């Protein structure tokens, strides 16, 4: 299934930085932290996180920053998306040399000219040095689009999960709402192989703060908001909900699945 991904972060006031004074040594370049929001079409990429070969969103962004600064630049994302998954509001931060300080609203244009059309910077703001895109995040939102059309519209290819079988949207909504709250989501997690060993007690407990099901024509949108998610957790929950709507599985508390 394909989805969209967004991150909510704590609001931060603009940071303060001084430009280097004339004659100052360039041995250590003062840096300014910037919070960026990006949107991207995930189809051409192997996910967010950097990998050998450079075909990820992070790799493409870092090349754009490095080209602009003339020096290698590492960015830090608020979360990771899998291959083919899109984002409407992926937050990340970068540290820019003070020599490149420009008004915050000029950063999107400066970077977008160096990026492919499938990636766009939509917002930038200066933040204090203690801000971290991952650790300052207060919530994450994932949205999945399901097409119920008998024949998938070509323009939905790669953007919607095709499920033309008959199922009740009302029961789908009931199933999705069962995931609200704090539960043990072991049944909705795929192990990467890099989990801490032994796995700590409570590792699979997660809190979902909001769920929503909306229908527009032949499209159904499922939205989950939470403080954090396990690997492939949202994809597995989205896959289970229509099965409950079809009656192939019963509605149960997710902690007992």
What are these regions (language model features)?
Residues 28-257:
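Structured-RNA-binding interfaces characteristic of tRNA pseudouridine synthases
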